[in-house]
From Swiss-Prot:
Disulfide bonds join 120-137. The keyword Signal applies. It comes from the Bacteria. It is found in: Secreted. Gene3D superfamilies: 2.40.50.110, 3.10.20.120. The gene is entC1. This is Enterotoxin type C-1. Coiled coil: none annotated.
């Protein structure tokens, strides 16, 4: 083998090693959506109130809890009580796979997430399409408690920039007490602010045609959630919230968040 061919082989082997063992930022990053990818508020003819209640002040929140049961291999059940409305005392959170459920099964965790009641099943005896009394369901929303909080009860501010028709119209901060926080928690807090300040969701519809919330991690990876319901006259809360089942977490100190909205007359 001549020298030039040997060098070429070495370069090729080195390149293969990089591909196999170096995290591929671009492959893991979700590109920004095109307009055609986003749901349109005008195409939804049901009540937007059913979306609004998912991001109001009645989310599930608990600290230092352990799972007490499960229904399926990829979910966990917790004894968590609704202290505001007294609607439930048990919460089932469903995860993407059995591996995630096993990861948190015997851990002391914090739970924070948007919940639903219709099509919430704790056993095979629950009636399809009915509300199960004293119980509620969610997806993801789990973080380990030990070592995941700031000293002295300090809170981390997370900046959120809002763009309406591509123009930065408002910026605000939400707070979390967690170092590693679920994207779901930050999403809930961001949308809650926008409901109160910008009427993001109204009873029948929304002043906005499209919307998505984008998370930018410290390594450059990005991902987003569509903020509008799918077309049609019915909104399936369980199906919509399923986007949180991967229990995606971000570093609260470094994550950047953008909300992109377009108005109906924009």
């Amino acid at each position: 083998m001549n020298k030039s061919r040997f060098i070429s082989c070495v370069i090729l082997i080195f390149a293969l090693i990089l591909v196999l063992f170096t995290p591929n930022v671009l492959a893991e990053s979700q590109p920004d959506p095109t307009p055609d990818e986003l749901h349109k508020a005008s195409k939804f003819t049901g009540l937007m109130e059913n979306m609004k209640v998912l991001y109001d002040d009645h989310y599930v929140s608990a600290t230092k809890v352990k799972s007490v049961d499960k229904f399926l291999a990829h979910d966990l059940i917790y004894n968590i009580s609704d202290k505001k409305l007294k609607n439930y005392d048990k919460v089932k959170t469903e995860l993407l796979n059995e591996g995630l459920a096993k990861k948190y099964k015997d851990e002391v965790v914090d739970v924070y997430g948007s919940n639903y009641y219709v099509n919430c099943y704790f056993s095979s005896k629950d009636n399809v399409g009915k509300v199960t009394g004293g119980k509620t369901c969610m997806y993801g929303g789990i973080t380990k408690h030990e070592g995941n909080h700031f000293d002295n009860g300090n809170l981390q501010n997370v900046l959120i920039r809002v763009y309406e028709n591509k123009r930065n119209t408002i910026s605000f901060e939400v707070q979390t007490d967690k170092k590693s926080v679920t994207a779901q928690e930050l999403d809930i807090k961001a949308r809650n602010f926008l409901i109160n300040k910008k009427n993001l969701y109204e009873f029948n519809s929304s002043p906005y045609e499209t919307g998505y919330i984008k998370f930018i991690e410290n390594n450059g990876n990005t991902f987003w959630y569509d903020m509008m319901p799918a077309p049609g006259d019915k909104f399936d809360q369980s199906k919509y919230l399923m986007m949180y089942n991967d229990n995606k977490t971000v570093d609260s100190k470094s994550v950047k968040i953008e909300v992109h909205l377009t108005t109906k007359n924009g």
